[in-house]
Structure formats: structure tokens, C-alpha cells
Amino acid sequence: MSDFVTFVSLGPGDAELISLKALKALQQADIILCPSTVSPVGNMLSRSRDILLELNIDDSVISLFDVPMSKDRSQAILCYKEVAELIEKHYEKRLKIVVVAEGDAGFYSSTHYISDNLISKNIPTERIAGIPAFIACAALANIHIAKQEEELHIIPGIISSNDLTKRIAIRNSIVIMKPSQSEQAIKQVMSSIDKVEIHYFENVGIKEKEFYTQDIHEIIDRKFPYFSLLIITKE
């Protein structure tokens, strides 16, 4: 048994980008709790589980928990509380428990709700680092996000056109993690700014769905999906 519940970061989606330490923790786990969602037609979807299976993790140790996808986070928060209660039962049985998260489990990851609940129960946790999506995106585009003394501003997703314009004017690099949450505001700014490079990504790490472009017109014409990301840098 491990004295800790381990939060394992899976990286952006490409199974080959997971760390050796993370892989070892997965291979030694008695149970792996893995987030999933339900599609509009009722199918259970889990990108995390897909990564685990690609890593040859035994499906029998994977336990899915459904995360409601809604702007009303009350149901999702309740779900995370229930997951923490389930983990508590496994912990009492002295099992090696892993909770997985895409990207890095400490960077805009909802797993912090689970971790906070476990800490309140005096159950110790540890976290294994992973590659966040924006780092993988920069590698795909072969760009440097920030150089020397440049600052980097990371926006979770919601931003107004005025605020985005002001941030661009400061001439710092900007990462917008979930541009679908402010799609119209972002497109309004994109159509009027200059002297910047705009890099747009979808589904980075998922080879058959991966998309990248710098074409402003193409970006504006696209509907931003949930798994999209923007990097804006000065020329």
C-alpha cells in the first residue's frame, strides 16, 4: 500500500508524452480512477481511458467516474465529492490508488476538488507532473512562447474583447486555454489586430483529430470546439 493517493498527470493526449514516473505509478496501481463524460447520444467517452489503454494498462483496474459537463458546476462538484468518498473506502482497504488527469493535474485541473476533499479527510495525496496542453501546442507549432524577459499571460477561457485587446497591446505572450468560452469576443479582436502571430490548435495529442493553423480567416471561420487553444505572440 502507498501512504498517498497519487494524482497522475497524463499529458496532452499523446501517450508517448507521459513521464516514466507516471507510467510506473499506473502500472503499480490497484485501482485507477478515470474521468469520463456522456456524449449527446448517451455513449461514455473518456480520453484519459484511451490513453491508459494505449499504455497497455489493464482495463480491469480502471474505474470511470462521470463528470457532468455544464456551466452549472454544482453537479460536477458533487461528483468529485462522491469520488473522494469512494477513494476513502479504497484507502481503508490499503489499496494503491491513482487518480488520473489530462495535461498536468496541478494546472487548471478539476482534480483539485477531489484532492481538497481528500485532504479534509486527512488522506495524504501526492502529484506526478505532466505536460500541459499549451506546452504541447507550442512544440507542435515549433514556436517559443516566451523569450528572455517576456511575460506570459494565461487566460482560462472567459475574457472580453476589450480586456483581450488591452493585454495584446502590452505586447506579452498570451495563452487562451478554452477559447470556445469567449469565441465571439476573440474573433472580434482577431479581425482587427496586427503585429501579432496567432496560433490556433484543436485536439493536440490526438493524432487523427489534431489541427493547427495560423490563418486568421480560417480560424475565424471555424467553430471552436471544447479542446481548442490559442497562443498569441508578438511578431
State what each model feature region is.
Residues 105-167, 221:
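Class I SAM-dependent methyltransferase SAM-binding "motif I" and its flanking Rossmann-like core
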